[in-house]
């Protein structure tokens, strides 16, 4: 079957697959955070929600510089904090450590699930780490 003029055909690109995988990861970590929150009460709910929002609060590190920056661009001095909070390896390694070590405080694990969900949603929607000037990496 051939495509007619003016129509487009769907393509599976690595970027689409990558974003789909990040979306699946986001849904998994969100579901895990909800399960942990339901099982362990308000402290788990509060920490899961806090860590779902916390990574984007790094924009406030240089809030005074915001009027001089482009929309959605953090100031260069906020970029290291932003990138540190948006690396998936950090909360994932902490979650692995939580499961291996004799730590038993479920709200901490719910917080890590919320943090991983945030990072995964960002990647699924096309947001990622920043350059040192604060622009999206390509």
Annotate each PLM feature.
Residues 2-138:
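N-terminal membrane-targeting hydrophobic helices
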